[in-house]
Amino acid sequence: MKLAFTKESWADYLWFQEYEPKLLKRINELIKDIQRNPFTGIGKPEPLKANLSSYWSRRINSEHRLVYKVTDSEIIFASFKFHYSKH
């Protein structure tokens, strides 16, 4: 599956690369796992509700969540920083 990043999620990814390399390693592990198993696996995957009902969330750590959407052809990453409730 193709990986796609929103403008916000790419900025988040670059921020982790510069300021939180240990968490970036965790993010990369989550991305690999999502490619293998989009709806199960590490990071406690959970479907989101309400206006984000087509998205899923995985725990990076207690503060940050990886939010993504799976389509027939790609995985779209919406954000990596904070909880999805901050959108």
PLM region descriptions:
Residues K32-R59:
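A short, surface-exposed loop/turn module that caps and links secondary-structure elements
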Residues L24-K32:
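PIN-domain endoribonuclease scaffold, especially VapC-family toxins
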Residues K2, A11-L24, K49, S57-R65, ...:
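Enriched for short, Lys/Arg-rich terminal
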